[in-house]
């Protein structure tokens, strides 16, 4: 026998979270690895500048994808708050706040990229600078996007850690998956802070190992939520959830938005 601890708003939010998570994941992978990476030539500002100028539309589409990813992150955090608030409203709010901070920091990257485009433009006031200096400055702007991501990564990791813990307490998803999420997300937070203090840390632990386990967790959860939805915990599994879920949970945005 089961106790109904999941209402229709949570079920709808689960579908929204699944779609938002998958779309956001697809956008960032496509923008990074299909559109942007081919244009960037490591340690060569001049070739990078020429590639960007020759493929401005491709470059701008990548920026648009990054902006859409930020929007998707806000949709995702709102849906996750709706799902997880009955488990622990304060923790769900904290997780949503961490993810919002990450989304805001993420949007600095498109601004840096637009600044790089401006430096490579043909405006009259740029004529006072040598072309190689402008190319170097544009490359610095692009490199700043890397810094933006790693400043935001601890917030992303903390958001994922909080959510994974709430998934574990709620029994809405398989327990093993939730435990993996807690470990992967906490690992990401640890690596992010170590890397910010010791920038050569990525020579010991590859950058991709910082956040890939957490990204895999979020991807699997998104697929689960979209196709499986959230499970109704068995009687006695989550008494706290059962008690709090009697209250109406709406799909409104958290109060801080």
Go through the PLM ranges and name each one.
Residues 1-249, 253-257:
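Hydrophobic, aromatic-enriched alpha-helical segments typical of multi-pass transmembrane helices
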């Amino acid at each position: 026998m089961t106790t109904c601890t999941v209402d229709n708003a949570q079920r709808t939010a689960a579908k929204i979270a699944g779609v938002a998570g998958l779309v956001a994941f697809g956008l960032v992978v496509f923008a990074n690895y299909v559109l942007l990476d081919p244009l960037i030539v490591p340690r060569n500002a001049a070739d990078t500048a020429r590639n960007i100028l020759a493929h401005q539309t491709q470059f701008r589409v990548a920026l648009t994808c990054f902006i859409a990813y930020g929007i998707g992150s806000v949709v995702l955090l709102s849906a996750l708050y709706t799902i997880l608030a009955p488990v622990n409203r304060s923790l769900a709010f904290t997780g949503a706040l961490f993810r919002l901070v990450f989304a805001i920091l993420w949007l600095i990257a498109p601004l840096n990229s637009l600044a790089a485009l401006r430096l490579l433009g043909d405006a009259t006031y740029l004529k006072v600078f040598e072309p190689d200096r402008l190319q170097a400055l544009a490359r610095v702007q692009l490199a700043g996007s890397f810094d933006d991501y790693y400043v935001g990564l601890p917030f992303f990791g903390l958001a994922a850690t909080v959510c994974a813990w709430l998934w574990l307490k709620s029994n809405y998803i398989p327990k093993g998956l939730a435990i993996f999420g807690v470990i992967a997300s906490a690992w990401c937070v640890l690596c992010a802070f170590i890397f910010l203090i010791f920038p050569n840390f990525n020579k010991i632990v590859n950058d991709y190992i910082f956040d890939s386990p957490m990204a895999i967790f979020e991807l699997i959860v998104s697929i689960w939520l979209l196709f499986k939805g959230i499970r109704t915990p068995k009687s006695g599994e989550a008494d706290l959830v059962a008690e709090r879920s009697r209250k109406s949970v709406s799909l409104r945005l958290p109060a801080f938005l």
